Amino acid sequence: MKIYLVGGAVRDRLLQRPAGDRDWVVVGATPAQMEAQGYSAVGRDFPVFLHPKTGEEYALARTERKSGRGYRGFVVDADPAVTLEEDLQRRDFTINAIACDEDTGTLVDPYGGVRDIEQRVLRHVGPAFVEDPLRVLRAARFMAHFAPLDFTVAPETMDLMRNVAASGELDALVPERVWQELRKALVSAQPSAFLRTLHDAHALGPILPELEALYGVPQRAEFHPEVDTGIHQEMVSDMAAKLAPGDDLVGFAALTHDLGKGLTPPEEWPRHIMHEQRGIKPLKELCARLRVPTEHQQLAEAVCREHLNVHRIDELRDATVLELLGRCDALRRPERVARIALCCEADKRGRLGFEDSDYPQGETLKRLHQAALSVQARDLDTTHLKGPAIGEALAKARVKAIAAAR
């Protein structure tokens, strides 16, 4: 029996980045031997065990053979005769196919992962890459994760990704996995790299057609010097990651705020009148398909519908501001307002040449929201009021408070 550290922990060590969970591979062992040494079996699809003291995962070396469609269609062989090199060969990218003997510090790198780390290249291990469509998504997510290090996708790997997209295999991805990869990308350093990689691989359309529809759609250059709505979508996602690092609620709402522009009739380009209303339908469809959590969907719908109103909040009547807050459910969910403000700021600054601009509208929205929130029904004299009249009096008092806070 021989144990090696593998995967992301080795990769991140070589990149001099903080490592996450450590994964181990065990060569030359059987499940019975692992359990005899106190390891607990937890793997459902293949033999994985938890260390009796550290709780870290130890997987028996295995090979995988394609047996059906999608990323679940594999036959696993975890025979003790499976070698370390065979186990590493089934992995997705060379940078993840490096093992380390922790006793000696010796690296086992049969597929050139160390070289690719040095050259900042994301490269597939072998032709079996095309057997698992999830790897296309993982490639895009890795590009977003490692964007600050200037990684590129190897041309031959991009060719294989396009082959997977053309094969129809991406249709076999289960919604939860697509959402999981998207969610990770949204909190990465540069979510745009996720979008751009999938777009270049012709995979964004099959996976996220609502986002692919924005590429090539022009906007008015005086407001959007970047012109292409797809590029604007990338810039907004990156700005959201900068303004709200680690917040996938903000990331998702910012990403999807302009979906309506993908439905603008070409004869109306580059104007997109009413795109904020048109965007709700494709947003609902995307959320239903990916089974997006309700909290994410509600925030995204609020930002999609109201971002133009927030941009011009100084021009809105006081009563209209209260109506806006009501549509966003901000009086019952006050924590939502700060996120809406961040999303709208990301939209405004996610434009070529506007990256460093101020966005006072965000502070105005929060200030007026606090003013409205400071007035509660219990603060009013409702002695002679009944039913709807109480609500009307509360609304009038809140409008007055908003006016005073201007």
Curated annotation (Swiss-Prot):
Residues 229-331 form the HD domain. Magnesium is required for nucleotidyltransferase activity. Nickel for phosphatase activity. Its EC number is 2.7.7.72, 3.1.3.-, 3.1.4.-. GO terms for biological process: RNA repair; tRNA 3'-terminal CCA addition. ATP binds at residues 8, 11, 91, 138, 141. Coiled coil: none annotated. Its cofactor is Mg(2+); Ni(2+). Pfam families: HD, PolyA_pol, PolyA_pol_RNAbd. Mg(2+) binds at residues 21, 23. Keywords: ATP-binding, Hydrolase, Magnesium, Metal-binding, Multifunctional enzyme, Nickel, Nucleotide-binding, Nucleotidyltransferase, RNA repair, RNA-binding, Transferase, tRNA processing. SUPFAM superfamilies: Nucleotidyltransferase (SSF81301), Poly A polymerase C-terminal region-like (SSF81891). GO terms for molecular function: ATP binding; CCA tRNA nucleotidyltransferase activity; cyclic-nucleotide phosphodiesterase activity; magnesium ion binding; phosphatase activity; tRNA binding. InterPro entries: CCA_bact, HD/PDEase_dom, HD_domain, NT_sf, PolA_pol_head_dom, PolyA_RNA-bd, tRNA_CCA-adding_enzyme. Monomer. Can also form homodimers and oligomers. NCBIfam families: PRK10885.1. A single active site specifically recognizes both ATP and CTP and is responsible for their addition. Belongs to the tRNA nucleotidyltransferase/poly(A) polymerase family. Bacterial CCA-adding enzyme type 1 subfamily. Comprises two domains: an N-terminal domain containing the nucleotidyltransferase activity and a C-terminal HD domain associated with both phosphodiesterase and phosphatase activities. This is Multifunctional CCA protein. It comes from Stenotrophomonas maltophilia (strain R551-3).
